[in-house]
Amino acid sequence: MEKKVQKLHDKKNIALVAHDNMKDPLCKWAKKHSFKLSAHQLYATGTTGHKLEEATGLSIRKCVSGPLGGDQQIGAKISEGEIDILIFFWDPFEPMPHDPDVKALLRIAAVWNIPVACNPASADFIISSQYINEEYERLVPDYDAYIAKRLG
């Protein structure tokens, strides 16, 4: 697939998602980094978003809860260019009834070349990156070229 450059602004759109057993670690992480996070637009799935607002006092744009379609809503926002970074604390020890949704979310993040953190250590690396508060150019699929080629 052909690629094109997409410019990210210094204020990023960051999605925060966590499975049930990982909501507290995500809230703890977000509270620790609330100053840096406050410079960005934050999104979350439903329950996680409410817990994050309570823990940090930050404003969060909330989708529905993950098992009710929130993971898919976040994925749609990624494919529409509305999410720049995904912080997704998932529990590797718990079977997930909505596992296909989780796999789809991670696949979409990979397709659209967005940074993904799956635990506090990887999230620390992203939030402390020099690019978090700077403009950044990334390669994304060129959908217009894709359609033109398909309709050719």
UniProtKB/Swiss-Prot annotation:
Catalytic activity field: dihydroxyacetone phosphate = methylglyoxal + phosphate
Transmembrane segments: none
Top enzyme category: lyase
Signal peptide segment: none
EC number: 4.2.3.3
Residue positions of the active site: D71
GO biological-process terms attached to the record: methylglyoxal biosynthetic process
Residue intervals of the MGS-like domain: 6-152
The keyword Lyase belongs to this UniProt entry's keyword annotation: yes
UniProt xrefs under InterPro entries: Methylgl_synth, Methylglyoxal_synth_AS, MGS-like_dom, MGS-like_dom_sf
SUPFAM superfamilies tied to this protein: Methylglyoxal synthase-like
Sites where the protein binds substrate: H19, K23, T45, G46, T47, T48, S65, G66, H98
GO molecular function, one term: methylglyoxal synthase activity
Pfam family, one: MGS
Keywords on record: Lyase
CC per GO annotation: cytosol
Domain of life of the source: Bacteria
Purpose: Catalyzes the formation of methylglyoxal from dihydroxyacetone phosphate.
Family that this chain belongs to: Belongs to the methylglyoxal synthase family.
Family matches, as HAMAP family: Methylglyoxal_synth (MF_00549)
Protein name per the record: Methylglyoxal synthase
Organism from which the protein derives: Teredinibacter turnerae (strain ATCC 39867 / T7901)
Gene for this chain: mgsA
